[in-house]
Every structure is written in structure tokens, then in C-alpha cells.
């Protein structure tokens, strides 16, 4: 790797997976510790004026964007200011900016897979913010890659998987939608994709733009939950019961969560040669890490 790489957010689950996989291939990232209050315009300016990497992976707000149950509007507003400044700095210092986004920018009203050309219609406050973050990067920093991921799965406390497993161990009745579909995407796989993109950008390939990636095969949230419990019982045999099917419309998060969230991954395959991997193959490693830390 000729490019000097910087990673914001090396402490979260996706950042850790990226650092692990990079180390296996002797690819190093500058991974600065965030200030106590998190990255803001002033601290980003000081950092990039001094360091000036060739490419920057922005995972600074990963937990808020992809794992937290709720995010306060004030936090998203502050992040918007930070991303605006980050994009300006990347333009000024000629830094490639790679930033994740989400299936959540779509409303989930259509049953077929979403491509990068499909109309965006975010449902929730967080999804609307993610769309604005995308637009900031597109408008300000031409040398960018935006990666929209499917249902990101990791072992982090307070994340999607953690909530699911704590619920399963609580003994309460368990319900998941059997008519809500998406692409479960373990963080190990998402990290592989980010690394693959960086390697090709290192060869001076100007492949800027927006790309979709999700694990195969697409699944209902019920099927994903059941697969998770099968793996979890290898560590906690006493997990009492299985999930009961429920309609998407009856789920408490239905107003905010797209019912149909399957992403078409043809563009990333055709452009970068990145093939989707089976999420079920990587799920055991995440569950294993989860129970090692709990």
C-alpha cells in the first residue's frame, strides 16, 4: 500500500475489524485517538493540517449511525458540522474520503433490490441525517467513495446483536418480522470490502461514487434472528425460546425501519470485482467475540 491511510473510529467494532484485517496484510492505518468530546471541526482541522494522509476512512460515528437504538437530534446536528468540515479538509489537502452509509436512506416501499440509482426517501431522523451526510461529501469532495451497507452486525455493547441476544436471554416473549427483508452484513465482511476498495484506489483508479454492499443471501429479520439464536446456544444452552413471526407493520420500529431493505451489489462487483459473501459463514465469529466479552 503506497497511500498513507488514516482511520477515524478505530475503537469501534468496524474499526477494529479493519485494523485486524489490515494488520494481516501489512496494511497500516494512522488511527488517532478521538478527543474527549469526539471529533469536531476544530480538532479535525488540527489533525489533518498536521497529518495529511492520502486517504481517510471515516468511521468516527459508526455506533450512532449503525448500532445505537436511538440518536439525539443534537448529536446528528453536531456530526453534520464535523462532516462538512471534514469534506472541506479532504478537498483542500487532496485526501480521498471513504465514508459508510446505510440502506436506511430508502423507505423500503418496493420489494425489489435497491440500486445506487434508485430514489432516496429516508424515514427516520437518523436516516435523513445519513442522507445529508452523503450529500455533503458528494458536493464538497469529488474524490470520495460512499459505501451503503445492509444490516451491519457486530459484537458491540448496545448494538443490534447485543439487543437481540439480551432480549433472547430475558425470558420475555420474542417477536421478529417475517416480512421484513435485508442483507445481514457482519462487520468482518464490511471491513473486507473497505480494504478491497482502498487497495484499488491505491492503484490510482479514480472509481469515485456511491456503492452498495450487503451479505448474501438476503433474509428476513426473523431468519436472521433464528440463525443468531442457533449460534448463541452453543455458548448459552439455556436460552429459552425461539422468535415468533410478526408482521413488519406490528413491530414497534416499523415507522423508522424500511420493510424492504435488500441492496443490489452489482455495481461494486462490476467496478471493484468485490463479490458478496454469505453472512451465515461469518456470524459464528461475531457471536464468539460477543460471548467472550460478556
Regions found by a protein language model. Give the residues of each.
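SDR active-site strand-loop-helix element
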Residues: 8, 59, 97-103, 147-149
Amino acid at each position: 500500500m503506497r497511500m498513507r491511510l488514516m482511520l477515524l473510529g478505530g475503537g469501534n467494532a468496524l474499526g477494529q475489524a479493519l485494523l485486524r484485517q489490515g494488520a494481516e496484510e501489512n496494511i497500516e492505518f494512522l488511527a488517532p485517538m478521538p478527543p474527549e468530546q469526539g471529533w469536531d471541526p476544530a480538532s479535525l482541522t488540527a489533525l489533518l493540517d498536521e497529518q495529511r494522509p492520502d486517504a481517510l476512512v471515516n468511521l468516527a460515528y459508526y455506533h450512532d449511525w449503525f448500532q445505537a437504538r436511538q440518536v439525539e437530534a443534537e448529536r446528528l446536528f453536531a456530526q453534520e458540522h464535523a462532516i462538512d468540515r471534514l469534506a472541506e479538509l479532504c478537498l483542500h489537502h487532496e485526501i480521498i474520503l471513504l465514508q459508510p452509509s446505510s440502506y436506511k436512506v430508502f423507505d423500503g416501499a418496493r420489494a425489489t433490490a435497491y440500486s445506487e440509482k434508485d430514489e432516496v426517501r429516508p424515514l427516520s431522523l437518523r436516516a435523513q441525517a445519513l442522507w445529508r451526510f452523503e450529500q455533503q461529501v458528494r458536493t464538497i469532495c469529488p474524490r470520495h467513495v460512499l459505501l451503503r451497507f445492509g444490516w451491519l452486525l457486530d459484537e458491540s455493547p448496545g448494538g443490534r446483536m447485543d439487543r437481540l441476544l439480551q432480549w433472547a436471554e430475558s425470558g420475555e416473549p420474542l417477536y421478529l418480522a417475517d416480512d421484513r427483508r435485508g442483507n445481514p452484513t457482519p462487520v468482518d465482511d464490511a471491513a473486507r470490502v473497505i480494504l478491497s476498495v482502498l487497495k484499488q484506489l491505491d492503484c490510482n483508479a479514480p472509481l469515485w461514487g456511491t456503492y452498495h454492499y450487503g451479505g448474501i443471501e438476503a433474509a428476513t429479520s426473523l431468519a436472521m434472528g433464528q440463525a443468531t439464536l442457533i449460534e448463541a446456544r452453543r455458548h448459552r444452552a439455556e436460552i429459552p425460546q425461539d422468535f415468533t413471526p410478526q408482521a413488519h407493520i406490528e413491530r414497534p420500529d416499523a415507522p423508522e425501519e424500511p420493510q424492504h431493505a435488500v441492496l443490489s451489489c452489482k455495481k461494486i462487483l462490476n467496478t471493484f470485482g468485490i463479490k458478496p459473501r454469505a453472512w451465515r459463514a461469518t456470524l459464528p465469529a461475531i457471536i464468539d467475540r460477543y460471548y467472550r466479552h460478556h
